[in-house]
Every structure is written in structure tokens, then in C-alpha cells.
Regions:
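Solvent-exposed serine/threonine-rich low-complexity stretches and specific carbohydrate-binding patches
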Residues: 31-40, 122, 135-145, 248-256
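Beta-strand-connecting loops/turns
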Residues: 7-8, 52, 92, 104, ...
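Exposed aromatic-hydrophobic patches
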Residues: 43-48, 97-98, 147-153, 258-265
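Noncatalytic modules at the cell exterior or secretory-pathway interfaces
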Residues: 47-62, 152-167, 222, 263-278
Length: 293
């Protein structure tokens, strides 16, 4: 018998020496809540519980050793700390979750649904500007299923809050990660950063100036290509490739996880990549890489 002491998301799991079936029943011992705890999974989420709820774990008659693990996870949270995980039980209304950014950073939220309900969740960011909350970048919706739905922003120092609109009775897990991102950018072609390996950088909502990168082709026997991609909420980036002042190619990247490739001419020389935001509200990361083929 398991009796719940605190309200929240109830979790139960087992560690066993064999593969004997171990089900979980309701308080009346009639309805099976979890068919088998001992099927190789680390844990099972039974659902939202309140103080005093009861469950029964049915063990086999012959048993060597079984360890039963139980816990209740809070389904409400307010402020967030870096590299921490939180759970929320949706109310169908917007909830706000404050966090601080000390230095220019790449900020990421991985959102996963727990349980059977996997409806869309509304997401956006606000910044505290002189005591007033103002939206940063674009709003979006994610539909978290088995896998994480990632939302990424490029943010300058300040006080922020994550706004979530989770459907009523839907349980979500939110993992918050913040990584400092030093501002390494060249704003003139003559000072372009030499692209020798893969790089990534961010644009915050207030950063608008174009940035320059240089790619050198030293052999005509093999060709070189530049890969371009991004991770942002809405908006996107434009990449223009130049040689000797002439624009060779323009590529717009508006979808995440969509890598585009520009094959450079089979000709020695220096090529330049100019990066700009497609919209003033774009905030997030862009990625540049090169390879020889």
C-alpha cells in the first residue's frame, strides 16, 4: 500500500532481480493504473494526486528482491535557475516564471509533455524594462510529445520571465539552460572573422548590425562549401556570399533544423559571408560551418 503525503505528480518505480510482472492498482484494488512497473522502464508517472490518495503495488507470491521507489513532484513553479527542471499542471491560463540573465547568453527551454495529453503550449518571453514587462521577439506554440520541443532565445543581461499557456490538466516538464555567449563579431568586411571551423553565435533583440566572416579557398583540386542554419523563435537570418565585391549567392534561413549549403566556386581566393537578421524581432542563434569535398 502507498499513501500519498503531498499533492503533485505521483511517480513510482521498481528495481527487481527478475522480470516478474508488477502492476499498480487504485485504492479499491480493482482498476489497474500501471500495467507493469517491471518492464524495463525506470519510472512511471501515475498522474496528479492529492494528499491521502492511495495505491497498491501487487507483488508476485514468489519473489527474490524488489525495491519500490515512490515520489511526488511539485506541479507549480515560479522562478527558474540555470540547468534545473520544473513541472507544471496546466490551468488553461498564462503562467509566468521569472529568471535572470547576468551576461549576454543563449537561453534554451526544453518542453516535454508528461502523460497522455499532448496539446499545443503557448510560449513567449518578456523583459522587465524600467518596471514594465515588454515582450521580446516572437510568440510561438510548441506541441511537446515524446521528444523535447526546444525554444531558444539570444538574450542580453536583464530580468526576464517565461510565459506559458498550458492547456488545462496537461502536465509539462520544462528544462531551463543558460549559456554565456561572448560577443565575437566583425562589422566590417575588412575585419571579417576567418571561418576555419564550425561556429555559432547569437543575435539579441537589440543587435541589428550585419556581421562578416571569411572563407579561404587555397586549392582548385577540391571544392569547399559553407553550411548555414539557425535556431530561433520566428524570424530568421540572411546569408550573402561575396567574392571581390560581387555577390555570388543569397540564402535565407527561416526554419530551425534546416541546414542550407552554398558550394563555393572551384577557384582560389577569399570569399566573404555577410550575416543579417531577416526581421528586427529575430532573436536566437545562427550556425556557420565549412567542409571540403
Amino acid at each position: 500500500k502507498i499513501k500519498v503525503a503531498d499533492p503533485g505528480l505521483f511517480m513510482v518505480g521498481v528495481v527487481s532481480n527478475d522480470e516478474t510482472k508488477i502492476p499498480v492498482y487504485d485504492a479499491a484494488k480493482k482498476r489497474i493504473i500501471v500495467n507493469n512497473l517491471n518492464d524495463g522502464g525506470d519510472k512511471e508517472y501515475v498522474g496528479i494526486v492529492k494528499t491521502g490518495d492511495e495505491f497498491y503495488v501487487k507483488l508476485p507470491e514468489k519473489i527474490d528482491k524488489v525495491i519500490i521507489l515512490t515520489g511526488v513532484i511539485k506541479t507549480e513553479f515560479t522562478s527558474m535557475a540555470n540547468q534545473k527542471s520544473y513541472y507544471e499542471l496546466g490551468k488553461g491560463t498564462i503562467t509566468y516564471h521569472p529568471f535572470s540573465v547576468a551576461k549576454r547568453s543563449k537561453v534554451q527551454f526544453d518542453i516535454t509533455s508528461i502523460g497522455k495529453k499532448h496539446e499545443k503550449v503557448g510560449v513567449y518571453i518578456e523583459k522587465n524594462v524600467n518596471g514594465t514587462w515588454k515582450k521580446v521577439g516572437y510568440s510561438t506554440t510548441v506541441k511537446p510529445d515524446k521528444y523535447d520541443s526546444t525554444v531558444l532565445y539570444g538574450l542580453e543581461a536583464g530580468k526576464y520571465r517565461l510565459a506559458l499557456k498550458t492547456p488545462k490538466d496537461q502536465i509539462i516538464n520544462v528544462e531551463y539552460t543558460r549559456d554565456k555567449s561572448k560577443k565575437k563579431a566583425a562589422y566590417k568586411k575588412s575585419k571579417a572573422i576567418h571561418l576555419k571551423s564550425d561556429i555559432d553565435s547569437i543575435y539579441t533583440s537589440t543587435e541589428k548590425a550585419a556581421r562578416w566572416y571569411k572563407v579561404s579557398v587555397s586549392s582548385t583540386k577540391k571544392r569547399k562549401a559553407v553550411t548555414l542554419s539557425k535556431d530561433s523563435v520566428g524570424g530568421g537570418f540572411k546569408f550573402c556570399v561575396y567574392q571581390k565585391g560581387k555577390r555570388l549567392k543569397t540564402v535565407k534561413v527561416t526554419k530551425n533544423d534546416k541546414v542550407k549549403t552554398v558550394k563555393l566556386p572551384k577557384k582560389k581566393g577569399a570569399y566573404y559571408v555577410k550575416v543579417t537578421k531577416l526581421t528586427s524581432k529575430t532573436t536566437g542563434a545562427y550556425y556557420l560551418g565549412t567542409y571540403t569535398y
